[in-house]
Amino acid sequence: MSASRFIKCVTVGDGAVGKTCLLISYTSNTFPTDYVPTVFDNFSANVVVNGATVNLGLWDTAGQEDYNRLRPLSYRGADVFILAFSLISKASYENVSKKWIPELKHYAPGVPIVLVGTKLDLRDDKQFFIDHPGAVPITTAQGEELKKLIGAPAYIECSSKTQENVKGVFDAAIRVVLQPPKQKKKKSKAQKACSIL
């Protein structure tokens, strides 16, 4: 039996968007009720996706600005990033292209990014928006638009609280590494012609 491939998956995104909850929900099928900024040990497990077994290593990062200099140290060797924003936070959505994409392109160019909208359960919760009048929901169409803008191969919306699509996030991350999307090649006129001398 051949050894399974190791995939390093790093979560990034603004503080309080639900990165740690997503990881805890995926690895333990439980939802932490208290907000504790980034308390998730690195985690590794064998996962089967499309018949292939991989050893998935999960790394959590702190989104707060206090960690801007420390956070990139965890990017080394990353095979894929899960870039999370909250579906109920316009600021976290805007920071995907303003802050996170420039940071990832600088420290880890060429590493694929799976874009993830978190807190799906709250997007349709009318009471949440009554209690938080400044909150603006992000639509699926806006998420898809952002995916195209940043060139991410996948966009997934999930809820760590209800577990909806949580497994799908990590399956997508594994798939992006095992079957990278084909890059569109632009052929120049010189490449099309064949000359024999």
UniProtKB/Swiss-Prot annotation:
SMART domains: RAB (SM00175), RAS (SM00173), RHO (SM00174). GTP binds at residues 13-20, 60-64, 118-121. One of its GO terms (molecular function) is GTPase activity. SUPFAM superfamilies: P-loop containing nucleoside triphosphate hydrolases (SSF52540). It is a peripheral membrane protein. PROSITE patterns: RHO. PANTHER family: RHO FAMILY GTPASE. Inactive GDP-bound Rho GTPases reside in the cytosol, are found in a complex with Rho GDP-dissociation inhibitors (Rho GDIs), and are released from the GDI protein in order to translocate to membranes upon activation. This is Rac-like GTP-binding protein ARAC1. It comes from Arabidopsis thaliana. The gene is ARAC1.
